[in-house]
């Protein structure tokens, strides 16, 4: 992991810990989850918001006022709006995507949920998704949400990622392994 990424991750983790603990104490985790979803959607949809959090041309006061206006317009919780203003005043808005990811993980963990990123060569049927979800739930002991991606380059099979664990049963990886074995022999 590169140095700037690890610094960003550390900063995001500290903010996420503070926000999560405050929301948990106030029994406001569902509201925090709504704020996370809303901010995530806003970041995906608004180039101006992405520019605001990444561009160094905005001063502390400008960024704080702008992000405060965004928080007010989105009707975010006071805690979320205040955190965003604090991040702007400390020039830390660039960690917002990592903060949202960290908060999403903490909320899911608190609810006993985990997200599995599943890559397949073609879209899985409803039956296949149900079987996979049941199998993964039995393995991890938590409720599993499947985030499906289609990548024809894997030829067949699946790549399943849950947290830091990955199971790669794709035909592409098996062909690559066979190719490496053949290189070693010849």
From Swiss-Prot:
SUPFAM superfamilies: N-terminal domain of the delta subunit of the F1F0-ATP synthase (SSF47928). It is found in: Cell inner membrane. This is ATP synthase subunit delta. Keywords: ATP synthesis, Cell inner membrane, Cell membrane, CF(1), Hydrogen ion transport, Ion transport, Membrane, Transport. InterPro entries: ATP_synth_OSCP/delta_N_sf, ATPase_OSCP/d_CS, ATPase_OSCP/dsu. Pfam families: OSCP. Belongs to the ATPase delta chain family.
């Amino acid at each position: 992991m590169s140095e700037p990424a690890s610094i960003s991750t550390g900063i995001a983790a500290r903010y996420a810990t503070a926000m999560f603990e405050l929301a948990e104490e106030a029994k406001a985790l569902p509201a925090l989850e709504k704020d996370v979803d809303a901010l995530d959607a806003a970041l995906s949809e608004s180039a101006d918001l992405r520019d605001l959090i990444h561009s160094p041309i905005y001063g502390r006061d400008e960024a704080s006022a702008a992000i405060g206006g965004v928080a007010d317009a989105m009707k975010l919780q006071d805690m979320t709006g205040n955190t965003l203003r604090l991040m702007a005043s400390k020039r830390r808005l660039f960690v917002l995507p990592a903060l949202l990811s960290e908060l999403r993980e903490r909320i899911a963990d608190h609810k006993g949920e985990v997200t599995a990123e599943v890559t397949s060569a073609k879209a899985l049927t409803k039956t296949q998704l149900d079987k996979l979800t049941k199998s993964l739930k039995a393995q991890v002991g938590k409720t599993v949400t499947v985030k499906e991606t289609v990548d024809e380059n894997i030829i067949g099979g699946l790549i399943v990622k849950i947290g830091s664990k990955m199971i790669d049963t794709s035909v592409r990886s098996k062909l690559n392994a066979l190719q490496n074995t053949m290189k070693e022999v010849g």
